[in-house]
Amino acid sequence: MVTCMDVNNLKLDGMELVAGESGLRRMVSWTYLVQTRPFEEHMNRGNFALIVVDYVRFDFKEVKKAIVELNDLGISGLAISVVDDKEFIPKSIIKKADELSLPLFYVRWKGASFVDISQSIGNLIMETNIMNKRTGDYLYNLLFGYNVNDRYVEKISGQFGLDFS
């Protein structure tokens, strides 16, 4: 399971947590680029939402409405980038994220990319899923395997950092 804390721990260039620290344990299922309403038709619970404030589709007034709606739909966290870094996220939005315990990240416009952020989060989710499957397979083989011997247990346990000696 990947959480917003894991996303924050990636220390992605140009991305910083600005609010909602109390919600960092929210589970992240995937990323979602916020563009089209109604949001519920395009996203799933646990999505990590990404919004670009471009002053055409989204301005900060629209973001303030969207943050409540997206939180009600179960997003895990929210990252906001502002075209050309024209301004920082308003204090009212930061306050709302804190009230909702919604992790809110600021993404620098220049040098940071939603594609890179999405890819990094996706890779983290996939790596975690693979590790969880390997752990599950290992435990299954320990419990129900027909040909489990001490050498197998020692070899596989070492891959998980376990020492049964």
Tell where the protein language model's regions lie, with residue ranges.
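Alpha-helical/coil-rich non-catalytic "connector" segments in signaling and regulatory proteins
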Residues: 1-165
